[in-house]
Amino acid sequence: MGEGPNNRSRVRRLRPFIAVGAAAILGAGAAIGVTAANVANASPTLAAQLAARFPGYHIPATVSKALYDHSSTATPIKHLVVIFDENESFDHYFGTYPYAANTDGTPFVAKPGTPKVNGLYTKITPQGPVGPLLTDNPNEYNPVRLTQSEALTSDQNHADVPEQKADDGGKQDAFVQNTESSTPSNGCGAEYCPPGIVMDYFDGNTVTGLWNYAQNYAMSDNDYDTAFGPSTPGAINVTSGNTSGGYAADANDTSTPGVKTTDAGSVSALGSDGTGTIYGDIDPFYDECSDSNHTTTSPEGVLTGPNIGDLLNSAHVTWGWFQGGFAPSSTNSGGAVCGSESELTSNGQDVSEVQNYVPHHNPFQFNATTANPAHLPPTSLKEIGYTDQANHQYDMSYFADALDGTGGATLPSVSYLKPPAYENAHPGNSDPLEEQQFVVSTVNQIEQSRYWSSTAIILTYDDSDGWYDHATPPVINGSDDSAVGDTSVCTSVPITVGSAEDRCGFGDRLPFIVISPYTRENYVSSKMIDTTSVVKFIEDNWLHGKSIPGSFDAVSGSIDGPGGLLDFNIPPHYAPVILNPTTGAVVRGDNWYGNQGKLKQTATR
């Protein structure tokens, strides 16, 4: 047996937050300090300064709780928690599911009767999965299994056009030359990055927790990125399904805050009104922690169309976006500083300090209506999920308060969770083992809370990172933008969603797991869905099907209904399946596994 989970030191030194709560606000050439008094109840001076600095934004007034509706849903799901991780393709995590090699890492043996997936194999033999995609792949390299000691890999190229080129007209045969971006000649440090790395995959000995959730709940093998491209479009799509109506704001022009500028690498296809499509990574304008805590002056993104938060606010449904590192660690002349860091470790060694908060991963900070530029805390814990000065944007620590009922807090109807960067699975600053710590710890906490019986947890990803996936994306919305360089994958298909260019999709396949008492156990759904299906479920469950103009929600598949991941026509299974956050092994709640450690050591193939 190779390196096991107990041999991997998991030293994590989370730098303490400095409880400033809000920032010093720069206005009229002077910084205004935020005191304890106006953090608890934002002062008129603070409100005026923020309004001047961020046109269109105002600190929301606290809305009476009597207006909120907590009971009206179309399904038994009263609470949705979306864990939105980073940069993994389906084949990269589940290409050989449910077969694990069991030569290293946490042992894994699938339950009898586990369904096969649309993966890298044609059949599974006693010696393992076999098929031409594994041994005679049309790409320059065959896929190779990654061991647990190789969990920390390099980051691949996951920009819009390189992903299109990798798909090569649907042949899926040009990944190495288009999305592989790190090889030993470039220097990889502690990251594992041999030639052909973009083709490689993990199995249940490393992504053990996710495989065990698939064993006990439901997983899709037919979920796609709403559009080709990186994290920011993915984040916008999971919260609105519409990346158009955006523009780049000049962060260097303090005399006219928010004035439009150009950023061809992030915002394209500008119309006569100066707005276009956000198709690349760009930090949000309504965020004092953008541009490396305002130590640089790169353009920042603004969105003018509504998102799901706007719709939930109109319907008086509680919601929140919870992100690691959102609480400011200090202030500078530009306002809030999100400087907290955590130690990334690999194979028992400290690798690097990773900043926890990544602004361009927070989609609600692009809209004046849903932003919290100064990272203000809620006026009290009871206000979590309700409209007040925090405007539904919170540090991750507040999610634990909501689950536990600390200070009278309650769990919002809809919660999006973005882990701190070292635990978000993004190659280069995280890995599957760090991700597992966050996911399993969070799911365990939800499963053991008073909300579990009416909750659905979705685990999915913002983009594929450019990792190989053999499934040809079903492109239903095209784009023909010569300035960007769209390929025939997109130019051969008309625009069917809205009217903007550079929203070509669906993109490559992503993992999508639902954990809930209302899933079938050990179920694989092949019903086609995409990232915006999350938005569609929220609209259908809480908003009577109300949709967002120009959104993919009009064409996205449902995660419930016939063939879906949620099934309300079968008896719910309330007993939670509790996993070990470090190993991913089942520790309670699954009768088949029983004494899982003993079973799996003796039942390896």
Predicted regions mapped to residue ranges:
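Terminal targeting segments of Actinobacterial cell-envelope proteins
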Residues: 1-15, 213, 312, 417
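GH16 jelly-roll
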Residues: 2-3, 26, 301, 307
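N-terminal pro-sequences and low-complexity stem/linker regions of secreted or lumenal proteins
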Residues: 36-605
